[in-house]
A protein has these predicted regions:
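Feature captures the catalytic ectodomains and active-site-proximal regions of enzymes
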Residues: 1-511
Length: 511
């Protein structure tokens, strides 16, 4: 008989001491109560730096399953670049160093372009400051900043303050000068609106647009300007504005586009680097630039260097189990199927050898408060059958209810969702015990543990609360301070397999 291990992920199930807002506490959960009382149980981190996100940021299903399957903290781009700037790795980044060396060799200018805010969705202003410091430390003085103004991921009229802050920081560093500002409406289009992008390009290359000697003042003036629809021109819509006495982007120069999210960085980048670009006429033809994308915007993008290349996750749990000849099953309903397959496998779509997958259709309802049971029962039927078949070494199972119903903000529905999961967990446990296997019970992030905001309104987001980790079917001791990336090393320990060096997580079982 195979050495069976089942990992059951209760999506959106966090531990929250505040009972009044907590659908999990309000639910009747005899099976979970029994597990948490009788079996080795601890809390593990599922948010912030524990999963490669900034401190205090809630986790999500994609990040959670990626970290579980990888067996290591997988840093998201914002955190990855911030960490690189803080620990000095940025100074050694080949693409960034080469861009600066190009300017030194040719006596040309360095242009830093990107979203000028601390929103952290597309960019972060701290990354800009780090780049200016790096270029200054490497001996450059001609450093020009082309700021795309936000107003979506930060307040709509905050750009003037960001410009003031940037100017103060540049004065402190002793380098860096704002050369162009414009709303992201122009510089970060993603719908092939080439008339807008053309205006951005004209300002950056030809110096066409509103002329000013004070970027912040020009933006504040924009706030008082009404467009043809009768709306004030807030940050997102500020017209392309050129600061007098600054240089334009020209052949021989280096450009570093410091946005890390690809979707809104592709179009403006293509105007500079694609010889076949035909969205509008580039007067004078394509410029000869040393162009660096902060991350990979598009694998087919020509004539660019990439500063932070995609992370290749070698030896994820699924890949490693396949290599060891073990059989595995991934099972979830539609809403979480990609999470137990694609994300759990580190962004790899293909099935590994001896990896089976079962997809159960999620119910077709407008919102899941209308059917909080979702498809948990049919998922449970199929997984119990798979467990008792004796066919699998490892089964990865997800119950979607606590998360998907939690997002509706309907407290009573979330309670029903939790109770449904409790019933299913009890059935899965019975099947695992029948086969003398081991079950690990956990979650990827919180949600149903907080359904009411401080002001009394429905709370529909994820939480930053820790999640459970329980071991059913084996007596053992668990350490504190674990996180999601420690689950795969724990699984390998239980299976008696050596941990691959790529997995830097540590088993939660101490004996």
């Amino acid at each position: 008989m195979k050495k069976l291990l089942v990992l059951t992920i209760m999506d959106g199930f966090g531990f929250n001491p505040v009972k009044e807002v907590n659908a999990i506490e309000a639910a009747k959960t005899p099976n979970l109560d029994k597990i948490f009382a009788e079996c080795p149980t601890t809390e593990i981190g599922a948010s912030g730096m524990d999963v490669g996100l900034p401190d205090g940021q809630m986790g999500n299903s994609e990040v959670g399953h990626t970290n579980i399957g990888a067996g290591r903290v997988v840093y998201q781009e914002l955190t990855r670049i911030t960490k690189s700037a803080k620990d000095g790795d940025m100074m050694k980044n080949e693409a960034l160093v080469a861009a600066i060396e190009n300017c030194k060799k040719k006596g040309s200018a360095l242009h830093l372009m990107g979203l000028l805010s601390d929103g952290g969705v597309h960019s972060h202003i701290e990354h800009l400051y780090a780049l200016v410091r790096m270029a200054k430390d490497m001996g450059l003085t001609e450093i020009y900043v082309h700021g795309l103004l936000d107003g979506r991921d930060v307040p709509p009229s905050s750009a003037a303050d960001f410009i003031d802050a940037a100017n103060a920081e540049f004065a402190k560093i002793g380098a860096g000068k704002i050369a162009t500002v414009m709303g992201r409406f122009y510089g970060m289009d993603r719908d092939n609106r080439w008339d807008r992008v053309g205006k951005a390009y004209a300002a950056l290359v030809y110096g066409e647009g509103i002329l000013t000697d004070d970027a912040a003042a020009a933006v504040r003036k924009s706030y008082e300007t009404i467009d043809e629809d009768g709306k004030y021109l807030t940050d997102e819509f500020v017209l392309p504005t050129v600061i007098e006495g600054t240089k334009r982007i020209a052949s021989g120069d280096s450009v570093i586009f410091f946005n890390f999210r690809p979707d809104r960085a592709r179009e403006i980048t293509r105007t500079f680097v694609d010889p076949d670009f035909a969205g509008f006429e580039r007067r004078g033809g394509m410029l000869d630039l040393f162009y660096v994308c902060m991350t990979q915007y598009d694998a087919s993008m020509p004539n660019v260097e990439v500063a932070y290349k995609p992370q290749s996750l070698k030896n994820t749990l699924g890949e490693y189990l396949a290599e060891k000849g073990m059989t595995q099953l991934r099972i979830a309903e539609t809403e979480k199927y990609a999470h137990v397959t694609f994300f759990f496998n580190g962004g790899v779509e293909v099935e590994y050898r001896n990896e089976d997958r079962i997809l159960v259709a999620s119910p077709k309802v407008a919102t899941y408060d209308m059917q909080p049971e979702m498809s948990a029962e049919p998922v449970c039927d199929k997984v119990c059958e798979a467990i008792e078949s004796g066919k699998y070494d490892v089964i990865i199972l997800n119950f979607a209810n606590c998360d998907m119903v939690g997002h509706t903000g309907i407290f009573e529905a979330a309670v029903k969702a939790v109770e449904t999961v409790d019933t299913c967990v009890g059935r899965v446990r019975a099947s695992v015990e029948k086969m003398e296997g081991v079950m690990l019970l956990t979650a990827d992030h919180g949600n149903a543990d907080c359904m009411i905001a401080e002001d009394g309104t429905p709370f529909t987001a994820h939480t930053t609360n820790p999640v459970p980790f329980a071991v059913i079917g084996k007596e053992c001791k668990l350490r504190e301070g674990g996180k999601l990336c420690d689950i795969s090393p724990t699984i390998l320990k239980l299976l008696g397999l050596e941990q691959p060096e790529e997995m830097t997580g540590e088993s939660i079982i101490t004996d």
